[in-house]
Amino acid sequence: MANIKSAKKRIKVIETKTLRNKVIKSKVKTLVKKVEVAVAASDKDLATKSLKDAVVAIDKAASKGVYHKKNAARKVGRLAKAVNSIA
């Protein structure tokens, strides 16, 4: 356990940020799964709608620093490619 006041504060701050990041990542994963399920079922309408929701969540996560912007772009690109592959 830290003895220095600033170190104690950093521990609290890290715990708070870790919790926030987990919530955001969990939401993104859920939305990505919705897109993947819709693609697997070849449901173009649901996949497109789910893709929009997922893109918004991924971009927000990237702007908050949860994901690196290139990581977010890669996730969005792969999802869009999957949705566009539906005939």
From Swiss-Prot:
**UniProt keyword RNA-binding present:** yes
Mind telling me which Pfam families this protein's record contains?
Ribosomal_S20p
Keyword check for rRNA-binding: yes
* Single biological process term from Gene Ontology: translation
Q: Which GO terms describe its molecular function?
A: small ribosomal subunit rRNA binding; structural constituent of ribosome
What InterPro entries would the database entry show?
Ribosomal_bS20, Ribosomal_bS20_sf
Keywords in alphabetical order: Ribonucleoprotein, Ribosomal protein, RNA-binding, rRNA-binding
What cystine pairs are annotated?
Answer: none
Give the domain of life: Bacteria
Q: What does UniProt give as GO cellular component? A: small ribosomal subunit
UniProt xrefs under NCBIfam families: S20
Query: Which protein family is named in the record?
Result: Belongs to the bacterial ribosomal protein bS20 family.
> What HAMAP family does the entry give?
Ribosomal_bS20 (MF_00500)
Function, as annotated, reads:
Binds directly to 16S ribosomal RNA.
What is the protein's given name? Small ribosomal subunit protein bS20
